[in-house]
A protein has these predicted regions:
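Short, small/polar-rich motifs associated with maturation and membrane association
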Residues: 1-251, 265, 723
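Extracellular/periplasmic, surface-exposed regions of secreted and cell-surface proteins
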Residues: 23, 70, 254-273, 279-282, ...
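C-terminal extracellular loops and terminal segments
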Residues: 32-34, 622-631, 670-689, 735-747, ...
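Extracytoplasmic gating/loop element in the C-terminal half of outer-membrane beta-barrel translocons
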Residues: 170, 294, 299-302, 319, ...
Length: 846
């Protein structure tokens, strides 16, 4: 639990825990990618597959706010910036704190949830030194490669699109035949850019060496690990260019030192050193070009092996990969902590005092070797016989590699803690424990003069009577220098109660129901993420396009102007959280079922006040104000069964989480129609037009509301007139689809073991969220883009108008079809096998 430990039976607050052993079942390069489907209430979603930058996006009980939904991550009691600096191999357990009593000790920092990461330590029973060596090697395969048309179909469909636009065909029958036969790949290229750039697989490997032991005076754990992840790009040599690569060395040394019977010391050191290397061209650009470059744009190389290109498209995707050089990022993160604990039994039994310090340093630096490559443009001509011919003209020159050293980025944190802990049982019936602590922390960033600083005073009392009736009360007083004087500190109270019904006499010896606990909690927590630095202050400076014109020549002069108004009432977000839970164990503890329900009312969310400033004031800037509110509610449960049949042991179970939010107060621009307001909808709800099909013919167009964006033709998207004014425009936009954060996530775990062999499977699923297809990747022929198989197969034509699933093809940036509408929204629900593991355990002496 927060800043301490409690007996789970006597805990009345809500939390979930997972062991490091469970996390290690997934071979991943970043810790967050091991969370999928494993922790109730925690949603993990992949946003990128780029090696070294593939951390999952994580939400704790969904979206709490329209601001920053980031949460606290603590390693051995002290905050860290993210998951990257720690690996599953060094983790003993992760605890997810959920309700107000569990979070209130963190004051204005705990509102979005807290993850407590506890690393491995030596244990008094470990005895002599134990050495552990682990090694794993894995192959990574691309889950899916988009499918696009080859040159013959591309050119044929491009002619169709031109005809739809009322324009003449671009490709002749001779050219179409050349693309179809593929006999001259330089004159009639047919390039699959994905196949030219991507390999069939990459690899990941990691190795760990650890030492663990204990004696009368010290318990210790020491670990060092190495991980390497190589990407999918072809043909790279590592000197003139580079595949995507990620290497990490991580280390940890934890020690508990028994100085005297009354005084113990805890010393921890952990960190990582990382190196990322990648092509000079950005990953986003690389993948966009692979998806949009036409297959007949030009061949990859000339007959002599030089890269090709053109004036309009000089960036040959393969040339960009192999000919521009490479970039790298070096980073390290080190956390060192020390804590002294002294028993004060001479004052009263169970009392102790402690003091601790934590230092954390993070550093990043960039380095690159860059160059330019020569490209040759294909020139198409007619030969003496009238046949099509091609030759290549050089348009640029090769350059040597040049070295670039990027700027440094460095952040340092320091935490100081001191406090008293109390833990005592009276007469076997009463258990009283408590905590009173003080903490201050500072964070400095290279290049910034002002230091981030916070102070915290917090207390907690826990009482249990005969392990049946439970009570917890928490309060903290927390402040930040990021707010105006007089408005920097806040009080965060919370309380919970619990009833262990299975310890009552009428259930105590029940053989079916072994454990039953009810609990409920309420309290106030805060969230100070999202506010910019000293946002309460007014700012003056040289504003862009804020100057004046003087003189007969009407010359422009910059001006020193006000850029932001002052708002000294600015404060943090506040959440009233209510939670109720049930924990059960059945059939000799073989079946476990836990469930929680929650309601959170978030207020004082920062929004822009621009909408409240009259335009005649001449003020062209805004000031953040605490005006928005969000309600978030949901449930989560876990179910697990462990069984044994002869020599076969097995388990089956899973987790389920649901979290839904609604904006209950907003500060938005007055809108033309009630259905256009964001209030009443979830955070991040997309808005757009409602598509009701395609125009069938000119008669259909004439008898439908006028679509004001551009003249339409048969096969264009047709939209619903929401307000009945017989015009389709921006005032007809309604809520479409769902936000991009899943409301529901679930996981299923299955396993079986027989005579040392074991098989384990993990499935995970996400649902109730959408993706919006909104760029050239999905718009055929716009800017000479490629066309996908699904667009070609579903395109509208007069012959298949009743079966069409895609608008008519066009070479224009059609402002009617390619605007925000539910036609481009896709349900992203998924269910997949996340992890499959087959193993055998060797037992010495057998």
């Amino acid at each position: 639990v927060a800043y301490g430990k409690q007996d789970r039976v006597e805990t009345s607050s809500a939390f979930s825990a997972i062991s490091g052993e469970e996390l290690r079942k997934s071979q991943v390069s970043t810790l967050s990618n091991a969370f999928f489907g494993r922790i109730p209430g925690l949603t993990a979603m992949s946003k990128s597959g780029e090696i070294g930058y593939d951390e999952a996006s994580v939400w704790l009980r969904g979206q709490h706010t329209s601001g920053d939904n980031g949460f606290m991550i603590l390693v051995n009691g002290y905050e860290v910036s993210g998951f990257n600096q720690i690996t599953a191999e060094e983790i003993e357990s992760i605890t997810y704190l959920k309700d107000a009593p569990a979070l209130a000790l963190y004051g204005m920092n705990g509102g979005n949830g807290v993850l407590l990461i506890t690393t491995k330590r030596g244990r008094p029973g470990d005895g002599k030194l134990k050495i552990s060596v682990t090694g794993r090697y894995g192959v990574q395969l691309p889950q899916y490669k988009p499918r696009f048309k080859g040159s013959y179909e591309y050119a044929t469909l491009y002619n169709e699109a031109l005809a739809n636009d009322g324009l003449p065909a671009q490709y002749t029958e001779r050219q179409l035949e050349g693309y179809r036969t593929g006999n001259n790949p330089y004159l009639y290229p047919d390039v699959n850019w994905y196949d030219e750039i991507l390999k069939s697989s990459g690899h990941i490997q990691d190795y760990t060496l650890s030492f663990r032991g204990a004696d009368r005076f010290v318990n210790y754990y020491v670990m060092a690990g190495f991980m390497e992840n190589k990407g999918l790009y072809k043909g790279t040599d590592g000197e003139n260019n580079s595949n995507i690569g990620f290497q990490r060395i991580n280390f940890r040394a934890n020690a508990d030192i028994y100085i005297t019977k009354m005084l113990t010391a805890q010393v921890d050191l952990g960190g990582r050193i990382e190196d990322r290397k990648f092509p000079q061209v950005g990953t986003g650009t690389m993948w966009k070009n692979m998806a949009t470059y036409a297959p007949n744009l030009y061949p990859v190389r000339t007959p002599e092996g030089y890269f090709t290109g053109s004036a309009k498209f000089p960036n040959n995707p393969v040339g960009n990969l192999l000919g521009l050089g490479w970039s790298s990022r070096h980073a390290y993160d080190v956390q060192a902590t020390a804590r002294l604990t002294h028993k004060l039994d001479f004052i009263t039994k169970g009392l102790s005092a402690y003091a601790g310090i934590a230092l954390n340093s993070s550093y990043q630096n960039g380095y690159a070797k860059t160059r330019q490559y020569a490209y040759y443009e294909p020139i198409y001509t007619k030969g003496e016989s009238g046949a099509d011919e091609v030759y290549f003209e050089k348009r640029s020159n090769d350059t040597d590699l040049s070295v670039w050293t990027g700027s440094d980025s460095e952040t340092s944190r320091m935490y100081l803690q001191a406090g008293f802990e109390y833990d005592r049982r009276f007469d076997g019936d009463h258990h009283l424990s408590g905590l009173l602590m003080y903490q201050q922390n500072t964070r400095s960033v290279l290049g910034q003069q002002a230091i981030y600083a916070q102070q915290l005073i917090a207390g907690r009392i826990n009482y249990a009577y005969r392990q049946k009736y439970l009570l917890e009360a928490v309060v903290s007083y927390n402040g930040s220098e990021n707010y105006a004087k007089g408005n920097r500190f806040g009080v965060f109270p919370a309380a919970s109660v619990g009833w262990v019904i299975s310890n009552e006499n009428f259930l105590k010896d029940n053989r079916t129901l072994n454990f039953l606990k009810l609990r409920a909690s309420a309290g106030l927590v805060g969230n100070n993420r999202g506010a910019s630095r000293f946002a309460y202050e007014q700012y003056w400076g040289i504003g862009a396009n804020k100057g004046y014109y003087y003189g007969t020549a009407v010359k422009y002069y910059d001006a020193f102007v006000q850029l932001a108004l002052s708002n000294e009432d600015l404060t943090w977000e506040k959440s009233a959280i209510y939670n109720a839970g049930l924990e059960t164990r059945w059939f000799g503890n073989r079946l476990a079922f836990d469930i929680d329900v929650f309601l959170e009312n978030r207020r004082d969310i920062l929004v822009d006040n621009r909408n409240s400033i009259p335009s005649f004031s001449g003020i062209g800037f805004s000031t953040p104000v605490n005006k928005a509110k969000v309600r978030n509610y949901g449930t989560e449960f876990s179910l697990m069964y462990y069984g044994q049949a002869a020599e076969v042991s097995y388990y089956a179970g899973g987790t389920f989480s649901f979290a839904r939010n609604k904006i209950t107060a907003s500060y938005e621009t007055p809108r033309a129609e009630p259905y256009m307001y964001r209030q009443g909808h979830p955070v991040g709800q997309p808005f757009g037009l409602e598509a009701i099909g395609f125009f069938r013919d000119e008669s259909d167009i004439e008898n439908s509301p006028r679509q004001a964006f551009t003249p339409v033709r048969p096969g264009d998207l047709k939209y619903r007139d929401q307000n009945g004014d017989n015009v389709i425009d921006a005032n007809d936009e309604v809520a479409i689809g769902r936000p991009t954060v899943p409301e529901i996530n679930y996981g299923i775990k299955l396993g079986v073991e027989y005579k040392g062999f074991d098989l384990q499977m993990l499935f995970d699923g996400l649902t109730n969220y959408s993706l919006y297809l909104n760029d050239y990747n999905f718009w055929p022929f716009v800017n000479n883009a490629n066309i996908s198989d699904w667009a070609a197969a579903g395109r509208w034509t007069p012959e298949n108008s009743a079966r069409a699933t895609f608008p008519r093809l066009t070479t224009q940036a059609n402002t009617n079809n390619y605007r925000s509408s539910d036609f481009w929204v896709r349900d992203m629900s998924l269910f997949r096998l996340r992890n499959l593991e087959l193993g055998y355990t060797f037992t010495p002496g057998k």
